[in-house]
Amino acid sequence: MSSAPPRSPTPRAPKMKKDESFLGKLGGTLARKKKTREVTDLQEEGKSAINSPMAPALVDIHPEDTQLEENEERTMIDPTSREDPKFKELVKVLLDWINDVLAEERIIVKQLEEDLYDGQVLQKLLEKLAHCKLNVAEVTQSEIGQKQKLQTVLEAVQDLLRPHGWPLRWNVDSIHGKNLVAILHLLVSLAMHFRAPIHLPEHVTVQVVVVRKREGLLHSSHISEELTTTTEIMMGRFERDAFDTLFDHAPDKLNLVKKSLITFVNKHLNKLNLEVTDLETQFADGVYLVLLLGLLEDYFVPLHNFYLTPDSFDQKVHNVAFAFELMLDGGLKKPKARPEDVVNLDLKSTLRVLYTLFTKYKDVE
């Protein structure tokens, strides 16, 4: 805290007015001290509110993050959480997905909070995903115009998500205020709703610092914010099954199931001089899955129906989706997995598909 400003020399007051002069000077000094201290205290409160014993100081805090109006609140992600590998992976996966969707628009997003806050990119993203056209101005520079565009875009998002029970954990002010947590909640919900061909890391949780200004002072608190749970829960499509239990509570039994499935698939793929040692990776492109179904049902799959040597994500998804169609044709139920999950090396999804085949064809020679 800075000291009080030096006082200029003043003539000695007559003795009879000593008390009055002393109190007057003291009052002036205290007033100057108070004013200086208020400025310094506000800066120090901002620093101490953001820093906490459980986390290092935020070195990239913007000045505006500690300049709040009375009763105003601002949130920011704890720096430790920003460095968490799963958080970084979530941000990267979402960035890559957005850029892939908007590739034809020649839009490249480099930083979520800086590139999405004004509604321009969100508008284009929603129009692409929902195959619609929003009635908004193409370019808006003013804050009012940006918020009006955001309002229109978020209302369209709400119309899509709310009927399906998605919690809306964002609003115009949080998105326009570059609140990364709110932006991530929005993007995760969109990715799940539109079944994006991506694999979001599960159980991503961040610590959020909430700073509020009350009676001229800044107060902070930490809250835990869950950004993702599991794919099944976020999709809201599947009930827990035996594989959830195996993965969560019985890894030893899970290994036995994997060995049994490897034995089962090799029993048939060996007829084509093919052998599987890793279920997670060797079924990811869909080729072995298609060939296995042909062997199990004793038919030849025309090569023009699938990609024998797929070299892109879309071709692999096509192969797995085609295999799912063959399963339906064979009288099996639709697998409790998405083709994208199998392609993205989600072991649980791959095991579910193979176990479905095992239960029907385990006695086939």
Swiss-Prot record:
Biased composition (Pro residues): 1-12
Topology class, membrane: Peripheral membrane protein
Tissues showing expression: Expressed predominantly in heart and moderately in spleen, lung and skeletal muscle.
Protein family according to the UniProt entry: Belongs to the parvin family.
Subunit structure and binding partners: Interacts with ILK, ARHGEF6, PXN (via LD motifs), ACTN2 and actin. Interacts with DYSF.
PROSITE patterns associated with the record: CH
Name of the protein: Beta-parvin
Residues that bear Phosphoserine: S8
Biological processes per GO annotation: actin cytoskeleton organization; cell adhesion; cell projection assembly; establishment or maintenance of cell polarity regulating cell shape; lamellipodium assembly
Gene Ontology molecular function, alphabetical: actin binding
Gene3D superfamilies, alphabetized: Calponin-like domain
Compositional bias (Basic and acidic residues): 37-47
Stored CDD domains: CH_PARVB_rpt1
PTM comment, free text: Phosphorylated by ILK.
SMART domains per record: CH
Calponin-homology (CH) domain mapped to chain residues: 88-195, 255-362
Annotated Pfam families: CH
Lineage: superkingdom: Eukaryota
Keyword set, alphabetical order: Actin-binding, Cell adhesion, Cell junction, Cell membrane, Cell projection, Cytoplasm, Cytoskeleton, Membrane, Phosphoprotein, Repeat
Keyword Ion transport: no
Main location: other
Keyword Transmembrane helix: no
SUPFAM superfamilies, sorted: Calponin-homology domain, CH-domain
Cellular location(s): Cell junction, Focal adhesion; Cell membrane; Cytoplasm, Cytoskeleton; Cell projection, Lamellipodium
Known role: Adapter protein that plays a role in integrin signaling via ILK and in activation of the GTPases CDC42 and RAC1 by guanine exchange factors, such as ARHGEF6. Is involved in the reorganization of the actin cytoskeleton and formation of lamellipodia. Plays a role in cell adhesion, cell spreading, establishment or maintenance of cell polarity, and cell migration.
Record region (Disordered): 1-52
Species per Swiss-Prot/TrEMBL record: Mus musculus
